[in-house]
Structures are given as C-alpha cells and as structure tokens.
C-alpha cells in the first residue's frame, strides 16, 4: 500500500459535483475520490446529499483533498464547482473561492454568473457521440480530472472500472476519455482574472 504523505503545510482542495438526481453525480464523485485517495497518495473525504425524489431532485457530492489528515470533511470554500444544470449553478456559485473555477454543462446551463467559467457540452457529447445521455457524468468526470490537476487519468480509469456495471466498461471509458480531451483543450490561465480584495481601495 502506498504510504500517505506527511507534509508540514496542508494544501486543501475542494470540489463539488452538483446537479439533479439521476445524473450520476454521486457516482462520479465517488470515482474521483477513490482515484485520488485509494489509487493516489493524498488524503480525501467524500460526502453527499440529495433530495427525497428518486430522480430530478437536487443532488450534490463533495470531495475534499489534502496532503495532510483532513480535520473537517465538508467543503467550505470550493476550488472547483461542477454544475450540471442551471439550478445547481444558481444555488452553489457563491460557495466558490474568488479564484475558484466554475465548470458547467453548456447544454443545460445557459445563464452564467461569471466570465471565469468553463462551459463544455457534456450532455451533447454523451448523447450524440456515445449514444447514451447517462454517461454525461463520466464525460464531466474526465474534464474535472484534468481541470482540477488533482488526479491522473490512469487512476480515474482504475477507479471507474471498479464502480460501473459489467458490460459498460467500453462506453464509460470512452466517455471519460472524451471528457479528458475536452478538458485538455482549456487553458485556465487565459480565463479572466478573479477580482480580489486588493483590487479595491477601502
């Protein structure tokens, strides 16, 4: 077993997967967390919540990553927010850190609250290229893996293969790789710079 790192300074990184029930966001978050903490070498906590509806209700899952043991498992200030529908974007955008990254499904989120956003066609790729809307979560997962910089594609694949139904491996891996491709096209450094408190005279 790979030993967990012991460092003097913890670097905490928080990700929230959000959308509606039935989009597979909790599964995506679990795969992401296990890729980081089980197959990777960092500490990780994964939590989730969802509405009483089986499908269509609110759904969110959080992953907290650190180089040191995590003292509080809930996200406090998000480094990255994935919003897979408009309601999630509206509800959780203000939980982002000023320099945090908003990632949305461009097919389902039309009203963007900031120009510092990555909008990618997760649902359209899943539907039109792979033939199953249900794997939009895996397309998004691939992009999040790249954009977060917290996990390798290899470890995402390893984690994914332990969590998906037998017989769906090729479809899900294809979806993951398409997300990786889309995420790799994005240069975060070219996004608008966030406004910080130092930008204002008080």
Predicted features and spans:
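Active-site cofactor/cluster-binding pocket
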Residues: 2-202
């Amino acid at each position: 077993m790979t030993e967990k790192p012991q460092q003097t300074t913890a670097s905490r990184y928080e990700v929230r997967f959000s959308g509606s029930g039935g989009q597979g966001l909790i599964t995506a978050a679990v795969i992401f967390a296990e890729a980081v903490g089980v197959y990777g070498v960092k500490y990780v906590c994964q939590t989730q919540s969802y509405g009483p509806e089986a499908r269509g209700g609110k759904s969110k899952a959080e992953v907290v990553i650190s180089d040191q043991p995590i003292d509080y498992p809930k996200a406090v200030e998000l480094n990255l927010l994935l919003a897979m529908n408009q309601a999630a974007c509206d509800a959780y955008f203000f939980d982002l850190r000023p320099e945090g990254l908003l990632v949305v499904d461009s097919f389902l989120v039309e009203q963007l609250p900031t120009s510092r956003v990555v909008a990618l066609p997760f649902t359209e790729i899943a539907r039109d290229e792979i033939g199953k809307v249900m794997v939009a979560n895996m397309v998004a997962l691939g992009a999040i893996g790249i954009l977060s910089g917290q996990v390798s594609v290899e470890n995402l694949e390893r984690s994914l293969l332990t969590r998906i139904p037998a017989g769906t491996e090729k479809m899900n891996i294809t979806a993951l790789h398409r997300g990786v491709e889309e995420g790799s096209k994005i240069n975060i450094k070219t996004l608008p710079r966030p406004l910080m408190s130092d930008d204002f005279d008080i």
